[in-house]
Amino acid sequence: MSTWFMFMFQESNSYYADNLISFHNMVMMIIIMISTLTVYIILDLFMNKFSNLFLLKNHNIEIIWTIIPIIILLIICFPSLKILYLIDEIVNPFFSIKSIGHQWYWSYEYPEFNNIEFDSYMLNYNNLNQFRLLETDNRMVIPMKIPLRLITTSTDVIHSWTVPSLGIKVDAVPGRINQLNLISKRPGIFFGQCSEICGMNHSFMPIMIESTSFQYFLNWVNKQI
């Protein structure tokens, strides 16, 4: 989860988040190198005493500053397309979970497990030993290291189901069903929030996921049934 004065990404807990962070680091390195080169050229032009008033064109320079950006864009393009494909491609999910957005809470359904369903509301942040605006009365429980399919929609306005540590952000749109892969690498509790302004209590729509062992997940399912 995010902490005060945190400028980096949250600790990754999915393979998609790992890929996104690696891609971000690569793009940032390219941006830093381009910015450094640009600043150096500008300073050099201002500080050197040489000038050529008759230099009107240089085909070699024009070829270089056309080809190099094309190469850089291709270097950025292919990893980006690969990550987009991996996130959107649903490959043999073990089961599906449906997430339904409401103003201003989430509902969850487990169709393959006797159609378990429950609502998830934010807890009063005045209670002690809880994270402000992040704790919910019912957690979405998933087994770790097992590929799942998340299906999301909405009953009223557009919401966005977002869990940064899992590298997930998908819009919940009324009358439309969106889906994506969901997999957790290790056990823990992970927090997210609605990331689409959806009305007065938009800030009070937390998402709380508990990732646990498969045996514990089955025990939880039996208790819900």
From Swiss-Prot:
Gene3D superfamilies: 1.10.287.90, Cupredoxins - blue copper proteins. Keywords: Copper, Electron transport, Magnesium, Membrane, Metal-binding, Mitochondrion, Mitochondrion inner membrane, Respiratory chain, Translocase, Transmembrane, Transmembrane helix, Transport. GO terms for molecular function: copper ion binding; cytochrome-c oxidase activity. Binds a dinuclear copper A center per subunit. InterPro entries: CcO_II, CcO_II-like_C, CcO_II_C, Copper_CuA, Cupredoxin, Cyt_c_oxidase_su2, Cyt_c_oxidase_su2_TM_dom, Cyt_c_oxidase_su2_TM_sf. GO terms for biological process: ATP synthesis coupled electron transport. Its main location: mitochondrion. One of its GO terms (cellular component) is mitochondrial inner membrane. Cu cation A2 binds at C194, E196, C198, H202. It catalyses: 4 Fe(II)-[cytochrome c] + O2 + 8 H(+)(in) = 4 Fe(III)-[cytochrome c] + 2 H2O + 4 H(+)(out). It is found in: Mitochondrion inner membrane. The chain crosses the membrane at residues 26-47, 63-82. It is a multi-pass membrane protein. Component of the cytochrome c oxidase (complex IV, CIV), a multisubunit enzyme composed of a catalytic core of 3 subunits and several supernumerary subunits. The complex exists as a monomer or a dimer and forms supercomplexes (SCs) in the inner mitochondrial membrane with ubiquinol-cytochrome c oxidoreductase (cytochrome b-c1 complex, complex III, CIII). Belongs to the cytochrome c oxidase subunit 2 family. This is Cytochrome c oxidase subunit 2.
